[in-house]
A protein has these predicted regions:
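Short, structured segments at the rim of ligand-binding sites
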Residues: 1-194
């Protein structure tokens, strides 16, 4: 899920191999609701380069809601990635974190980067997408946890300029050698000692 979000945010083409597609549950369908196109090739997922992606609306035109739920629902660990991806989509979406407290308290960092997000309460945030018309701005930020950390990393990679993320140990706990893996894909990530 994180790499799918990264491909969308950076407008990159990406093939993710050996994803065990049958075990992804509704994750691919939720990305499709954000307008992210992908193709299943056996057990691989191919995400083509996309200049734009449009968030679906409900049939009556009302704003789409993406919410977490116990399996087979959407894993709460990906909500932060969906939130970041929505910042550059065309349209608006309500992200509803039902299962945990305080997981949306990283949105202030995205707002500092130029994202249009309204934090409704500790469980809900409305994202108004930029449709890639306004790039996020680089900034200095601190990773509060694994999920928010990788979402901030995705935001930083799509932003204009150089960002600094502190407390990267949080990201390392969930994503082994993330900088090496992303640099192999063309990213420019450097670890610095402070």
């Amino acid at each position: 899920g994180s790499f799918t979000g990264l491909a969308a945010m950076t407008r990159s083409e990406l093939t993710i191999r050996n994803v065990s597609f049958e075990n992804l549950g509704i994750i691919p369908a939720q990305f499709a609701r954000l307008g992210i196109r992908f193709e299943q090739h056996g057990d691989d997922i191919y995400i083509p380069q996309q200049e734009h992606y449009r968030i679906e609306n409900f049939m009556d035109g009302s704003i789409m809601t993406i919410a977490d739920a116990p399996w087979p629902g959407l894993t709460p660990d990906l909500l932060s990635v969906f939130l970041v991806v929505a910042t550059q989509a065309k349209g608006s979406v309500l992200i509803h974190q039902k299962m945990f407290e305080s997981r949306l308290f990283f949105v202030d960092k995205l707002i500092d980067m130029g994202a249009q997000i309204i934090l409704c309460d500790p469980h809900r945030a409305t994202v108004i997408g930029h449709d890639h018309q306004m790039r996020l701005r680089a900034t200095r930020m601190t990773s509060p946890d694994i999920r928010a950390g990788v979402a901030l990393l995705i935001a930083a990679m799509s932003a204009e300029g150089t960002s600094t993320i502190q407390n990267i140990e949080q990201i390392d706990r969930g994503y082994k050698d993330i900088d090496g893996r992303l640099n192999a894909l063309g990213a420019r990530i450097t670890r610095v000692e402070e």
